[in-house]
Structure formats: structure tokens, C-alpha cells
């Protein structure tokens, strides 16, 4: 009798294993939710670093008066000396 049983199980293995795996998975799923309990309260998401940076920059912009800027005539240099005169020792 056992050899016939094992031959049938081996022949129809896909048809046997799927329902068994389904039952084991369903029991495990419900057991996990039973052990875990109720759903935890959703945690309020924190702002990302880039969002906090944007908010900070906007706050800084709101505090400034954008009509008071230096004219181009008042600016003596457009680039720092160190960049333009790096390879010219006679100008240092």
C-alpha cells in the first residue's frame, strides 16, 4: 500500500504541494497577525532633508529685502584673485 501511495504522491506532486503550501501560508499569515495584534498607529512622516533645506531657504528669502543689492559698478572683482592668478606668480 505504501509504495502505491508514494508513487501517487510523486506523480501528482504539483497538485499536492500547492494546496499544502497554500494552507501553511494562510495559517502563518493569520498567526502572525494574531501575535502582532492591532495595526500600529501611523507615524507622522518627517520632512526629508531636501524639504527642510527648501523651507529654511524660503524663510531666509522672506526675511531679506531684495531691492537692496550691490550694483555691478560697486563690485570690484567678478572672480576671486586666487582663481585667476594661481599660475601667474608675478601678479601675486
UniProtKB/Swiss-Prot annotation:
Compartment(s) of residence: Membrane
Keywords for this protein: Membrane, Transmembrane, Transmembrane helix
Keyword Repressor appears in the UniProt entry: no
Membrane topology: Single-pass membrane protein
Membrane-spanning intervals of the chain: 15-34
Pfam families in UniProt: UPF0767 (PF15990)
GO CC annotations on file: membrane
InterPro entries: UPF0767 (IPR031933)
Statement: the UniProt record of this protein carries the keyword Transmembrane helix: yes
Similarity-based family: Belongs to the SMIM12 family.
Name of protein: Small integral membrane protein 12
Organism: Myotis lucifugus (Little brown bat)
Amino acid at each position: 500500500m505504501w509504495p502505491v501511495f508514494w508513487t501517487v504522491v510523486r506523480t501528482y506532486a504539483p497538485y499536492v504541494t500547492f494546496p499544502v503550501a497554500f494552507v501553511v501560508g494562510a495559517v502563518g499569515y493569520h498567526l502572525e497577525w494574531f501575535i502582532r495584534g492591532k495595526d500600529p498607529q501611523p507615524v507622522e512622516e518627517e520632512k526629508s532633508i531636501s524639504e527642510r533645506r527648501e523651507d529654511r531657504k524660503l524663510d531666509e528669502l522672506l526675511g531679506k529685502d531684495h531691492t537692496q543689492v550691490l550694483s555691478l559698478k560697486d563690485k570690484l572683482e567678478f572672480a576671486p584673485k586666487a582663481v585667476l592668478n594661481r599660475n601667474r606668480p608675478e601678479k601675486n
